[in-house]
């Protein structure tokens, strides 16, 4: 009975599961996130083994995220023009093909760093569109009343898949190699796409636009310029991405050079990172459509920064993973509130563009990955996280005090 109630959204924190198409979307996201979790671990470890350079690890993460910045505006414009269900299926197939190509290069032992970088960029292009359309389609399916719950549960599925994927990645890399790892990544992406075939409705999406893409892009720029709330949320999300989320690119360095736990340890660390996010998302989902979202958003961002600073004194694996879990609980809360408030502060027909704004914000990550990699290569990984955490904390405190209108958003 408890399981039935959960699947049909009778529990408060699982309210969005009452919608059939949301349950399918959640399952698809879970499967694709399994692949993404494996891919994140594999990419960092592969580049570190090929180059022995923390900077190159950061550069690889930057290559993976660069398309988010350059395609953020375009993805938002496209999201408001297409059937989001159909396009999500197409994107899942594309991700599976790219993972197979990477596996083929590794299995045949011809992979070079430039191959890895090029395919990382290609995968980033796929995910720039996937993230935009998935967030907008989640809102379509559950509607504004359950938007926060739906987005939190969708992020939860990403985290759960990421935990399982990270643990699997460490074991597969250690036993079968990175080539086999990318075959598993491809299978996960393909399975997620197949689940989407069962999704039926368009939800509460506005009528699909038929104006030229260029005109949609121009309208998007005008939206950002005219909607100050959206612009501020974009900038806050970008700052959190550059100085906060980029900590994950240093996990391979901590695993191998600071904590000496190897590929299996890296998998565990990545799983704990995702697990912390799960705790934060469960808390957020259980709160329902609460007021004072802006205050909670700022508090989570500040906690994120303070947690990163603690990494500089984490000298053993147990302290490290505990802090890692708490940091990512805060990170997941802040990120989900950014997405929710962006969509709640634009008209229905522009929510695709709003999520394109979020993708554009997280597309600033390459600057952060390159920067944190350079600092880590010069001063060490702990110092790099101390600096980034201090900057993020400062931004969170000053903007919370200086932007009362954003702080009062609900």
Mark where each language-model region is.
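Flexible cytoplasmic inter-helical loops of multi-pass small-molecule transporters
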Residues: 2-6, 198-219
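Helix-loop boundary and gating motifs at the non-cytosolic
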Residues: 6-66, 226-273
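Cytoplasm-facing, short amphipathic helices at loop-to-helix transitions on the intracellular side
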Residues: 22, 84, 135, 146-148, ...
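Short hydrophobic/alpha-helical segments at membrane-entry points of transmembrane helices
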Residues: 25, 111-119, 233, 318-324
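Structural signature of transmembrane alpha-helices in multi-pass secondary transporters
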Residues: 32, 64, 154-158, 273, ...
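Core transmembrane helices of Major Facilitator Superfamily
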Residues: 36, 122-134, 327-338
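C-terminal transmembrane bundle of multi-pass solute transporters/carriers
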Residues: 69-74, 81, 85-97, 101, ...
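Hydrophobic alpha-helical transmembrane segments
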Residues: 113-124, 149-204, 269-271, 372, ...
């Amino acid at each position: 009975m408890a399981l039935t109630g959960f699947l049909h959204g009778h529990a408060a924190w699982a309210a969005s599961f009452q919608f059939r198409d949301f349950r399918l979307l959640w399952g698809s996201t879970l499967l694709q996130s399994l692949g993404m979790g494996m891919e994140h671990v594999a990419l960092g470890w592969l580049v570190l083994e090929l180059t022995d350079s923390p900077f190159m690890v950061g550069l690889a993460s930057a290559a993976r995220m660069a398309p988010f910045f350059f395609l953020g505006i375009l993805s938002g414009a496209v999201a408001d023009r297409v059937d989001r269900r159909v396009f999500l299926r197409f994107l899942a197939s594309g991700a599976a093909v790219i993972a197979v190509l990477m596996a083929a290069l590794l299995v045949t032992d011809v992979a070079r760093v430039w191959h890895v970088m090029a395919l990382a960029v290609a995968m980033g292009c796929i995910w720039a569109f996937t993230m935009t359309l998935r967030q907008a389609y989640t809102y379509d399916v559950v509607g504004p009343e359950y938007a926060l719950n739906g987005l939190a549960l969708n992020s939860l599925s990403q985290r759960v898949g990421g935990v399982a994927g990270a643990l699997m990645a460490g074991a597969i890399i250690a036993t079968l190699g990175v080539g086999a790892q990318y075959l598993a990544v491809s299978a996960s992406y393909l399975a997620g796409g197949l689940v989407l075939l069962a999704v039926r409705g368009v939800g509460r999406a506005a009528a699909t636009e038929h104006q030229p893409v260029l005109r949609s892009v121009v309208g998007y720029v005008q939206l950002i310029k005219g909607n100050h709330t959206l612009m501020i949320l974009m900038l806050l999300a970008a700052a959190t991405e550059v100085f906060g989320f980029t900590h994950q690119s240093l996990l391979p360095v901590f695993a191998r050079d600071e904590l000496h736990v190897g590929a299996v340890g890296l998998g565990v660390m990545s799983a704990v990172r995702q697990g912390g996010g799960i705790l934060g998302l469960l808390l957020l989902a259980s709160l329902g459509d609460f007021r004072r979202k802006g205050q909670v958003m700022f508090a989570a961002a500040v906690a994120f920064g303070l947690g990163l600073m603690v990494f500089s004194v984490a000298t053993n694996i147990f302290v490290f993973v505990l802090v890692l879990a708490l940091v990512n609980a805060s990170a997941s809360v802040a990120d989900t509130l950014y997405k929710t408030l962006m969509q709640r502060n634009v008209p229905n027909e522009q929510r695709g563009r709003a999520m394109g704004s979020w993708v554009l914000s997280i597309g600033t990550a390459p600057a952060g990955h390159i920067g944190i990699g350079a600092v880590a290569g010069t001063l060490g990984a702990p110092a790099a996280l101390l600096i980034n955490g201090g900057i993020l904390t400062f931004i969170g405190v000053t903007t919370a005090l200086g932007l009362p209108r954003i702080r009062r958003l609900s």
